[in-house]
Amino acid sequence: MGLSVVTLRLFLIAMTIAFVGCAARYAASPGSTTIAPGLQFAMPTGRELGYSIETAQLITAHVRDQVQVFQAYVSVTPDKITIIALDPFGGRALTVTATDDAIHTDVAPIVPAVLRPGNILADLAIVYWPASAVRRGLAGTSARLYDDKRERTITDNGREVVHVSYQGPHENTWTNVAHLRNIAYGYELDLRSTVTTK
């Protein structure tokens, strides 16, 4: 079995059970991340989602031989995207805040290095943002997005690197159930959302 990230996706994640309370690390990053070796994805803004939303997510992450389940809170407004992920004991494991200017992260030591905050944000955008925003994020690369009512696929030079499947139609709505598989980096995310405010 494997482990899945998120959101953000996002994304996401082999978290260890013991939270030792070590100091968190803080970083700011530019507005793009690598979603497959050599493939940059420019982060869409909250504005590009087309609506504001607050949602609680149950994320099951499969990475290599590990499976981890965690809860996340996601808030998207035109000016800011916030993702807060909690460890199994309810402690804050990860916070990602993205504005038009930068991505800021606060990551607890229990979060493995394979879980990069930029990828959590990219996974969230690939799953939930409109196809036009995802295509803009891939502009200038050789990658292509294929999108229909129940799935999305990103290919790069003819090979599939990311695949998303949905329980139902997903365009212009925050779907309740989605599954993201990053073939290039070898992880999968099962995403179950409960929208609290829209």
Kindly label every feature range from the protein language model.
Residues 1-12:
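Bacterial N-terminal signal peptides that target proteins for export
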Residues 12, 49, 62-64, 73, ...:
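Generic marker of residues within folded, mature protein domains
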Residues 18-21:
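C-terminal motif of bacterial Sec signal peptides marking the signal peptidase cleavage site
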Residues 23-38, 45-46, 58-60, 91, ...:
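Mature, soluble, non-transmembrane domains
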Residues 40-78:
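Post-signal-peptide N-terminal segment of Sec-exported extracytoplasmic proteins
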Residues 64-99:
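Extracytoplasmic beta-rich ectodomain segments of secreted or membrane-anchored proteins
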